[in-house]
């Protein structure tokens, strides 16, 4: 099992070595900006490296939105992110599910997701990540994910399970992996994060493993059950220990 972390994009290879990571995740630009990622001077070196690199798409992306001023730029920046990810030989691009304005728009939100994926041209796989909060989110509640997957599941999209988001959404971690696999047939990546807040809070505040509200045994069990590469999106201080903890507990 590959275990690693979300690191600074400045020098992912050096960061991986410093943290003892088998795999890393990076942003290719400002995650709060609509600006396209800039070409990287080290693109060839990253592409040639044996280290798997995942790319997290900008947080602003909302493919489900009815607002053209959000949805159209979302499609554009996802396309640009996928192209930039291909330039560095990335393993996949991870994108959040987004949301709609009210319950009456949820089914249309699913269809907007479908249109976005049908129009997307990418050499790199795209993974949908479950999210922590939002009353009208596409990927917070597992029952909503199931409805979304009925619409987009045959596009080849993958799935990234975030443990903190699952906890914050009020979904039980004890059988989360089994339930998601029953919906999607796959888990391609795990974001293994503790949570600073109580279950069902809707708050996306990560904590280092063992320092938050989630029983570390639950995190280990989820990672083992998923059987996918793992990224710790935790604070710099303590993240190396998070990797070592998971490696020891999973025998990886």
Curated annotation (Swiss-Prot):
Any idea which positions bind Zn(2+) 2?
Answer: 129, 162, 191, 233
Q: What is its EC number?
A: 3.1.21.2
Give binding positions for Zn(2+) 3: 165, 204, 206
As cofactor, the record names: Zn(2+)
* Keywords, sorted A to Z: DNA damage, DNA repair, Endonuclease, Hydrolase, Metal-binding, Nuclease, Zinc
Q: Which GO biological process annotations does it have?
A: base-excision repair
- The name under which this protein is listed is Probable endonuclease 4
Question: What is the originating organism of this protein?
Answer: Mycobacterium tuberculosis (strain ATCC 25618 / H37Rv)
The lineage, from the top, is:
Bacteria, Bacillati, Actinomycetota, Actinomycetes, Mycobacteriales
């Amino acid at each position: 099992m590959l275990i690693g972390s979300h690191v600074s994009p400045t020098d992912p290879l050096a960061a991986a070595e410093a943290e003892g990571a088998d795999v890393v995740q990076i942003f290719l630009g400002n995650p709060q900006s609509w600006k396209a990622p800039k070409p990287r001077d080290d693109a060839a070196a990253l592409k040639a490296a044996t280290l798997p690199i995942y790319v997290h798409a900008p947080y602003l992306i909302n493919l489900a939105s009815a607002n053209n001023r959000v949805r159209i730029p979302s499609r554009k920046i996802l396309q640009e992110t996928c192209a930039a990810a291909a330039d560095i030989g990335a393993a996949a691009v991870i994108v959040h599910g987004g949301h709609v304005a009210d319950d009456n728009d949820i089914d249309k939100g699913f269809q907007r997701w479908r249109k976005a994926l049908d129009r997307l041209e990418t050499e790199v796989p795209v993974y949908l990540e479950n999210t922590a909060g939002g009353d009208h989110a596409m990927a917070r509640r597992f029952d909503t994910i199931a409805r979304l997957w009925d619409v987009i599941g045959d596009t080849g999209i993958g799935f990234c399970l975030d443990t903190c988001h699952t906890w914050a959404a009020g979904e039980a971690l004890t059988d989360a992996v089994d339930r998601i696999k029953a919906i999607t047939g796959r888990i391609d990546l795990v974001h293994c994060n503790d949570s600073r807040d109580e279950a069902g809070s809707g708050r996306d505040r990560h904590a280092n493993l063992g320092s938050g509200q989630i029983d570390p045994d639950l995190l280990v069990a989820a990672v083992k059950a998923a059987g996918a590469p793992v990224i710790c999106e935790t604070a710099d201080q303590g993240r190396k220990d998070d990797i070592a903890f998971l490696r020891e507990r999973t025998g990886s």
